[in-house]
Amino acid sequence: MSRWTGAIGVGLSAGLSGALCLAASSLLGSLLQPNSLGWSGLVRMATLVIWPWSDDGHPLPNFLVALAIVLVVPVILVAPAARETAAGRGGYTMMWATWGAVLVAGALAGAAAVGIAAAASPGSSGFDVLPSGLQAGAGWALLVGWIPALIAAGVHAGRLRQVD
């Protein structure tokens, strides 16, 4: 197995698990009412974009763009790191590299989602809401980014055993 083949597999596992986390947190955020049970802060932070098919959901383009960014950016950033990580030093390195990649992806996805929403409203500028989108995306990634990080580290550890 080529080093790039395994590395792309690690990147895909990071991207797919990040996209699944985004979809799951969006669905959960739309199912839980933010003001009920005192969960408002946690639900708001764990939800990057609201599930588009809920009553109070964002338009579908917000969700799809955020999902595409969270899927593609970790693949682009994690695959080269997985290729260059040496055997025996892979677990923590891949975990932190993936968490950082998900953090970048979350910030970009949050900025894109609020930018699309701002473009749809006539009185708002995309540059005015960009910091809040970056903050929301980074907060989401800090809260749930460990899940794709652990999955990618596990896939990477299994890949190292196969190569050696």
Where are these regions (language model features)?
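Transmembrane helix-loop junctions in multipass membrane proteins, especially transporters and channels
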Residues: 30-34, 82, 86-87, 118-122, ...
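Hydrophobic alpha-helical transmembrane segments
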Residues: 7-12, 61-84, 95-100, 110
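Hydrophobic core segments of alpha-helical transmembrane domains in multi-pass membrane transport
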Residues: 14-22, 73, 118, 146-151
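Long, glycine/tryptophan/cysteine-rich extracytoplasmic
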Residues: 12-69, 124-136
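Alpha-helical transmembrane segments of multi-pass integral membrane proteins
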Residues: 105-164
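Aromatic-anchored segments of alpha-helical transmembrane domains
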Residues: 18-23, 102-112
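Cytoplasmic juxtamembrane regions at transmembrane-helix boundaries
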Residues: 1-6, 73-102, 160-164
